[in-house]
Amino acid sequence: MLYADARSVRTEASKQRQALQDFSFIRVSLVKGKGGWKIGSVAETKNYYTLSVNQAARGSVVKVIRLIRRFLAGEEMHHSLFDECVTALEFFSTEHADRTCYEHIFTQRILAQLGYIKLSDVPKDFTAVPLHELPGDIVCVHDTAIALSIKRAQNASQL
């Protein structure tokens, strides 16, 4: 995760205004300045919030981004975490039954990758399989245990 500054982005004449919105997947060029990173140019690839099919899907997209902002700090590269998040945003922006169960699995995976949850606590059936390939009936069987491990990790992290 990287935070950067952009000047006059909210003005009507700004060319970067449309691309620099929350929940956008963008391609950006950055310059390291004295006070941090500065945005040079930006091009929007897609906005997962606006592409979401309904209110529940938009809520799931918001939860993914909030989770990342809450637990990820610093300027380290996490390729697997990035890929997992993009896959989850694609998955959650469409219609799904058992949405809460899938959200819990995604949260547990992210917290395990960041070291807040032991990898042994993640069910082996869920570790390497993309969200869209997990059957809903199996996902919801483990939901109570997954939700409990997430709650313990969030309390222990004090974030």
Question: What label would you give each PLM region?
Answer:
Residues 1-159:
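Non-catalytic alpha-helical scaffolds and adjoining flexible linkers that form interface surfaces
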